[in-house]
From Swiss-Prot:
Cystine pairings recorded for this chain: none
Tissue: Expressed in leaves (at protein level).
Protein name (record): Protein At-4/1
Primary localization class, coarse: endoplasmic reticulum
Organism the protein comes from: Arabidopsis thaliana (Mouse-ear cress)
Keywords: Cell junction, Coiled coil, Endoplasmic reticulum, Host-virus interaction, Transport
Taxonomic lineage from the root: Eukaryota, Viridiplantae, Streptophyta, Embryophyta, Tracheophyta
Cellular location(s): Endoplasmic reticulum; Cell junction, Plasmodesma
Any coiled-coil regions, as ranges: 39-126, 182-247
Function: Involved in intra- and inter-cellular trafficking through plasmodesmata (PD).
GO cellular component: endoplasmic reticulum; plasmodesma
Length: 247
């Protein structure tokens, strides 16, 4: 764009120089025509017309020159503005390049952080998947163990119920046997007590008889026999007492 403006300016300057040269030639011709006006009256009108045309052309050229100067001034101002704009553009471009560099660095840093974060998350996900698989295996094994334990507990419960029933039946039978034995021993005890009372009565009678017949040998033997029976009954009575106490 600047090269085009320079070319236009050079073209205008060249045209201006040419016009100026034409203007000087025209003035010279006018002077020549004026000096020869007395001689060449026949050509005066033509020269006047030419002069008029030249004046008009001169005015036109002046206007053109003025416009060219204005354009040149505008172009100079435009060049100055363009230079300022170029400087501003360069500054903005430099700032943009700096910002782009910072932005690229920031993006690269964010990308690296993102990559690192993604890798960490992927590692955590893999670890969690492995842990989940392990937990699933443990849960399956525990469920199998729980099922097996439930079956074992049910079997043991049934077995325990059966054993309890058997033990209860056994103990009921043993208790009934013990009750029967106790009743029998109680009956024996009562019988022995009755016998003991009878023997005590006999002993009392025997003692009375012995007192009357102290010298009677037969009575002595009877007393001795009664004593032995009494001792035997006492021993049996003690044995029954111990049995009853232990029962």
């Amino acid at each position: 764009m600047a090269a085009t403006s320079d070319e236009q300016m050079n073209l205008l300057l060249s045209s201006f120089d040419q016009i100026y040269e034409d203007f000087k030639i025209g003035l010279n011709e006018i002077n020549v025509y004026r000096s020869k006006s007395n001689v060449e009256s026949s050509r005066r009108e033509v020269l006047e017309i030419s002069n008029k045309n030249l004046k008009e052309e001169n005015e036109r050229l002046k206007k053109l020159y003025t416009e060219s100067l204005n354009n040149f001034a505008d172009q100079l101002e435009h060049r100055t503005k363009c230079h300022s704009l170029k400087e501003e553009l360069k500054r903005v471009n430099d700032e943009n390049k700096s910002k782009e560099h910072e932005h690229r660095n920031a993006l690269e840093s964010l990308r690296q952080k993102h990559v690192t974060k993604v890798e960490e998350l992927e590692y955590k996900i893999r670890s969690l998947l492995v842990e989940k698989a392990t937990n699933d295996m443990v849960i399956d094994r525990l469920r199998q163990d729980l099922t097996a334990n439930k079956s074992h507990i049910q079997a043991m419960s049934k077995k325990l119920d059966r054993v309890v029933t058997e033990v209860e039946c056994k103990y009921e039978l043993e208790i009934q046997d013990l009750k029967d034995c106790l009743l029998m021993e109680q009956a024996e005890k009562n019988d022995i007590s009755n016998k003991l009372q009878s023997l005590q009565k006999e002993l009392l009678i025997s003692r009375t008889s012995i007192a009357e017949k102290q010298r009677d040998t037969t009575s002595n033997r009877q007393v001795e026999t009664l004593k032995q029976k009494l001792m035997k009954l006492r021993k049996e009575n003690e044995i029954l007492k111990r049995k009853l106490s232990s029962s």
